[in-house]
Amino acid sequence: RKGDGSMPVPGWTGEYDWAGFVPFDALPLAYNPASGILVNANARVVSDNYRYFITRDWAEPYRQRRAGQLLREVERHPVYGMIAIQADNLSLDAVDMVPVLLKSAPRNPRAAKVHDLLGRWNHFMLASRAEPLIYTAWITELQRGLMADELGNELYQSLATPNVPLMMRILREQPGWCDDGGTRVAETCDDIIARSLERALDGIARLQGPDIDAWQWGREHLAVHRHPLFDGV
């Protein structure tokens, strides 16, 4: 019927109730594929022309792609090999996105240093390195610069993490989104990329000081697992 479950709707009218179930034979299926591997990391498992709606909440494909790459490297994987795959931290979204960011020429010496760092980066998210921190802060600020004025603050805040494929599509196909509606000048995509870098670097400097060489991703990228009951005891 109406809607797809991605937004709140009046549940008492019946207009948005499910109309039925997907036939079992039409459910996505992969059985003993020729490649010998099955990979999923919450990424899309059906094509765009699949007739039934499953969800809008697919993960971006990068983890799925990377796991597939690693599994295809050798025919058999011992236990320690699977441990290495689980611990792999190559960022395929950085592989895709960094060249796009670096197309915008640096506008000051600090930006030039960052361009040099990211241009030589191997895209591994190592805790001891500055590059992962700079990259993540940059794309976070870039998404804000591209979308916050268009979507409004409330809707923008619903974007939990940077959406790299969406940003790449905007930069490639919808440059009108690069203009900041809150200013009197018409910004280009290069302007927004450069501005977002400055804001990212300023933000990191407030956290870790002005010395770029001393910055570390691991000091900001922390996973805290709190006990739901006893953490406050």
Show the residue positions of the predicted features.
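Glycine- and acidic
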Residues: S47-I54, H77-A87, P99-V100, G181-T183
